[in-house]
Amino acid sequence: MIQKFTNLYVTDNSGAIAVRVFQTYPGNRKIVPVGSIVRHSVKKIHRILPWGKQLRGRRKRIICRSQCGRSWIVQTSYQIPYIDGATLRFSKNRVLLVKRKRGIRIYRGRRIYGLTTRAVNNERTINLFRICI
């Protein structure tokens, strides 16, 4: 369960390490579960060069600190109950960074680290697993 001002870790190779939530969707909900979209602000990044410049000829866009965007909740430290009685709990809250282009989700990273739950494996996420194979 994630709410506003929660610090989350990024589980893809987009360049960000930690983000903070400032908006949940839909907007009238205080707490959102796994599989939801939230708005975030990047708090910590991998430093590529010490002065923060981009390498010459590098095509991939670098994520900057305090950059805002959408992210998709993949893991939470809150227990997720299943019908058969099992519960699933992760050690950290993790997200994937997402950008929308003409109504289609495009993921910033090309690789996912760690596990995902059953809640995020649906027809809307086929694009994600196609990219990561």
Curated annotation (Swiss-Prot):
Signal peptide (from-to): none
GO cellular component, one term: ribonucleoprotein complex
Compartmental location: Hydrogenosome
SMART domains membership: Ribosomal_L14 (SM01374)
One GO MF term: structural constituent of ribosome
SUPFAM superfamilies: Ribosomal protein L14
Pfam families: Ribosomal_L14
UniProt main location, coarse: other
InterPro entries on file: Ribosomal_uL14 (IPR000218), Ribosomal_uL14_sf (IPR036853)
GO biological process: translation
Presence of the UniProt keyword Ribosomal protein in the record: yes
Superkingdom to which the source organism belongs: Eukaryota
Keywords: Hydrogenosome, Ribonucleoprotein, Ribosomal protein
Assembly behavior: Probably part of the large ribosomal subunit.
Name this polypeptide is given: Large ribosomal subunit protein uL14m
Organism: Nyctotherus ovalis
Lineage of the species this protein comes from: Eukaryota, Sar, Alveolata, Ciliophora, Intramacronucleata
Record gene name: rpl14
